[in-house]
């Protein structure tokens, strides 16, 4: 009887621990994202963000995004970069285009840790369209698409949907987006 009771409690404890392991941050690019790691430490493990990581390295922004922040990063997937006109990514990755690449990448970053609930509050307070100032200095507008998905609008009129939200990091938060947003 005692042995059976111990086994039951052990199995219950294992079930609770296993259930808790899956809670919290989502899986991005096939890998679990950890809130104890910084933006770069998590991003390098996402199979969906290899182009973004290569671009951050080419622009010299890795050290910045490993820093204390906090930062909110709207992180385009590889598929988002694939939507750009042919040759755009290769051109931006050339050393002579580092300034242009940095401008595009820092346009995807906002100072502070802005969660989905924060974005929704801003949208509501702004009558449906909230304005964010990026680290690059430009503006992004945040709205609700179909009443349930957060959508970004860039200075050129392009839009991106947040596909995975609230990927919390030790130095901020990542929101995965399906399109690269572009500054003026």
Language-model segment annotations:
Residues 8-17:
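Bacterial N-terminal signal peptides
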Residues 20-184:
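Mature, structured domains of secreted/extracytosolic soluble proteins
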Residues 1-7:
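Bacterial N-terminal signal peptides that target proteins for export
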